[in-house]
Amino acid sequence: MEEIKKIPSRDQIPAEDKWAIEDLYPTDEAWEAELAALAESQKTLASFAGRLGESGETLYAYMEAFEQVNAKGDLLGNYCMRRADEDTRNATYQAMAGKFMGVAVALNAACSFDTPEIMAISDEKLAQFYADCPKLERYRRYLTNLRRRKAHTLSAAEEKLLASAGEMSQAPDTIYGSLADADLKFPDAVDVKGNKHPLTQGTFVSLEESSDRVLRQSAYENLYGTLASFKTTTAAILNAQNKQLKFFAEARKYDTAFEASLDATNVPTSVYKNLIETVHQNMDKMHRYVRLRKKLLGVDELHFYDVYTPLLKDVDKHIPYEQAKQTVYDALAPLGDDYRTILKNGFDHRWIDVYQNEGKRSGAYSAGTVVHPYVLLNYTGTLDSQFTLAHEMGHALHSYLSNKHQNPIDADYVIFVAEVASTCNEALLMEYLLGKTTDKKERAYLINHFLDQFKGTLYRQTMFAEFELNIGKMAAEGQTLTADVLCAEYKRLNELYYGPDMVVDDNIAMEWARIPHFYYNYYVFQYATGYSAAIALSRRILREGAPAVKDYLGFLSGGCSKSPIDLLKGAGVDMTSPEPVNQALALFGELLDEMEELTRE
């Protein structure tokens, strides 16, 4: 591993390696002017109160105004939030993000009447509205999906009250983000020669991938030791998150926050529970993988600071960003020329914020807009960074195609399908890399990475999902989620998932405190279901070619025009069945067989 250099400040990053945020608004002043105009829109929206049941024309006029306000709000929110993520210490953009949130909450309150009024329209009357006003068909999917949750919609006054509490409900996530990304400082990690390496949330995984075990252990103990010193605070934040989810779920007459969260995107709770059950049935493969890793590393004890380092050190190499882009472009050839033309456009026109800088948000994400998507990376030159590029551009092109082919109100796909688009790219990249090498060591190195993807995406994310489900149950039963409660449950699950060959210590019991997804409302299971669907789809694309690509691009262009389950069925995968998860885990077993064979001495 190359020695990590000092993390640059934002102004030291070349312009070509920063996203083109000016494509949204040329200046902060232009953004301020547009935000002021958006704030005025609440008067227009509020003027429709009490009138949505009058006629099809009135309902259409309101929906049109609502759609336009949401489209403008999307651009405004993206600008200030992307700016804030460039340097989380920058008070200007933190303030702008707060100002935007205030306007967004006011707009939500101003149109809080719409859901109860739309729910109050009878089926017969709404059918007449469509007949009288053909333009209203544009919003049929949206209105149908909204009315699906009629039993969980409150009176206009109650809806307004809940809407006005929206900003307050975001407090746990906001506070956690400020603590994790801006305020937490970690001691430098020290390598076997005594050299110091900057330790941040962003550099942690790169340090854990080092072949230097002393450095890995130092980074691991310094990160989790620091988190442990804040465990009372982080537990209180996560407890508050679960309390607010419980409050809103009960207010809307759901039995649990779990049911409320999944119903919001029309995904059956059985899909979540089937995932956990199916993974439990395949836990022997994960334990076998852990045993193999322990054997290949040649250690007496396998610790959690040993799980990221590549097993074949002499194949490990730095991948320059330009090379990573070309490799991803070449690997996605099975998706066709149209797909790759859009991909190259994104590479060439600064959709991506590439490198880490001081204060930059850790991790990676893609944010879609009607202008073009924005992708945040913290690229470090590892094989994992290359896969992250493929992953996030999968999200980006999904957003681009949905925005191109759907009305704004139908373009915003749900997370359940989002992870399919990103992970399919990763699966195609892996197939491409494996297909290019006959070298035994390089093949073993790549298969190791593929196995690590299964471990990290299917097993690990399912463990996160099970943790989230279990602590949600505790909160629902009135239990306070103290640090001791959270650590005990997290440690128990690590012992279950990693098995007897892994040392599960008190450090890893603190890992829940560095997982931001626990503030995303039963989100993480979709990484595992998405990975399973993506494995199935990537194999269909490689096997069948054009017909499968046509179905897949239709899926990517679908936005939220159908339920997520139906969109995936159209692409060729049924996620109500355990079959896709079983298929993916069967492949994991086959790869494990080959890895054992390739590394047998």
Predicted stretch roles:
Residues 1-314, 598-601:
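A well-structured
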Residues 12-15, 22, 26, 118, ...:
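C-terminal, non-catalytic "cap/extension" segments appended to globular domains
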Residues 253, 380-400, 422, 427, ...:
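Active-site recognition of the HExxH zinc-binding catalytic motif
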Residues 296-334, 340-341, 398, 445, ...:
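Long, K/E/R/D-enriched contiguous segments that form extended
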Residues 317-319, 352-371:
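Catalytic zinc-binding patch centered on the HExxH motif and its immediate surroundings
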Residues 317-319, 370-390:
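Short pre-active-site segment immediately N-terminal to the catalytic Zn-binding motif
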Residues 330-341, 367, 395, 399-407, ...:
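Conserved helix-loop functional segments at active or binding sites
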Residues 413-442, 450-452, 456, 530:
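Post-HExxH zinc-binding segment in Zn-dependent metallohydrolases
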